From Swiss-Prot:
Membrane topology: Peripheral membrane protein
Keyword field: ATP synthesis, Cell inner membrane, Cell membrane, CF(1), Hydrogen ion transport, Ion transport, Membrane, Transport
InterPro entries: ATP_synth_F1_dsu/esu, ATP_synth_F1_dsu/esu_N, ATPsynth_dsu/esu_N
Descriptive protein name: ATP synthase epsilon chain
NCBIfam families hit by this protein: ATP_synt_epsi, PRK13448.1
Localization annotation: Cell inner membrane
Domain of life: Bacteria
């Protein structure tokens, strides 16, 4: 399988940089996979789990929004936050969800809609992480 270069960058660090076979991205308009030779595209990333496949092994990384750019040079993801699933503190993540829920009553209109959507994404990540941890 052909490989391509992938960089995953967050404000804190370069979370990943190297040659990969495939990257599956949680896009705002739907999840999508990137392989070598993918058409150029820029896409918004929603909070979710990004999966990197390289050399037959998979690495899963929680991203909490950002931008993905596919070009002839490869794939670059600029993530708001990028944390390996093994490094996620489940208690802190649950507390973040609780705080988000408590803040909902103070929001209206579009702000409320965006907050509910973000909360739903966080709950989905929490479910995926807890399901993965059980296997």
């Amino acid at each position: 399988m052909a490989t391509f270069h992938f960089d995953l960058v967050s404000p804190e660090m370069v979370a990943f940089s190297g040659e990969v076979d495939q990257v599956d991205i949680p896009g705002a308009e739907g999840d999508f996979g990137v392989l070598a030779g993918h058409a150029p595209v820029v896409a918004v990333i929603r909070p979710g789990i990004l999966t990197v496949t390289a050399g037959g092994a998979q690495q899963k990384i929680v991203v909490l929004g950002g931008i993905a750019e596919v070009s002839e040079k490869g794939l670059t993801v600029l993530a708001d936050v990028a944390t390996a699933t093994a490094d996620v503190d489940m208690q802190d993540f649950a507390e973040t969800i609780t705080t988000m829920e408590q803040q909902l009553p103070g929001k209206v209109g579009d702000e409320l809609d965006r907050s509910i959507e973000r909360l739903d994404h966080y709950k989905s990540i929490q479910h995926q992480l807890s399901t993965t941890a059980m296997h």
